[in-house]
Amino acid sequence: DSLVQFIHQERYDIVMTLVSQRAHSLVAFNWRHERDALIQLAEKEGISYEVIDGTVPAERRKDIVQRFQAGQIRTLFCHPQSASHGLTLTKATTIIWCSPTYNAEHFQQFNQRIHRAGQTQKTETILIQAKNTWEPKVYKKLNTKLGRMENLLHILKEVS
């Protein structure tokens, strides 16, 4: 679409630099314009990729996961809501969050896609944030939510 302008080009450049330095990675995007910018850069740089978001049918998603796990795809661009449950993506060793999310459950569950049985390598999660924006506050709020979730689960374990 000729009306689209990517205003966070540096963000996408950083993400793709990180992707190019790793064998297999997952990149979480929250917005369609992020997905589109990442796809554009991956194609420009010749990086093999697939997308998992709400537009991808279940059978295609299954095929994408199998090809990724077989090493045929270098990176997956994923919307966390569409890829945070039921997928094992242990071929990846890195998760890169292109921008912050407020949703603690999606954040936690998406990060667990590479921390599963079958993961034999060291893993990392990278959070991209812009200085002098609301993004550091969002990540701080997200960490607070995660702490509360962990405390609640601990209390529930003690009660049961």
Report the location of each language-model feature.
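Conserved Helicase C-terminal RecA-like lobe
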Residues: 1-76, 81-87, 153-160
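Cofactor-binding loop segments of dinucleotide-utilizing enzymes, especially the Rossmann-like FAD-
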Residues: 30, 54, 100, 128-130
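Short amphipathic alpha-helical segments
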Residues: 38-40, 87-91, 108-109, 139-140
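Active-site acidic short loop of glycosyltransferases
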Residues: 70-73, 91-92, 120
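Short, well-ordered beta-strand core segments
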Residues: 76, 95-96, 114
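Flexible, active-site-proximal loop/turn residues at the rims of small-molecule/cofactor binding pockets
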Residues: 82, 101-102
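A short beta-strand element within the Helicase C-terminal
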Residues: 87-100, 124-127
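A conserved SF2-helicase RecA2
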Residues: 102-160
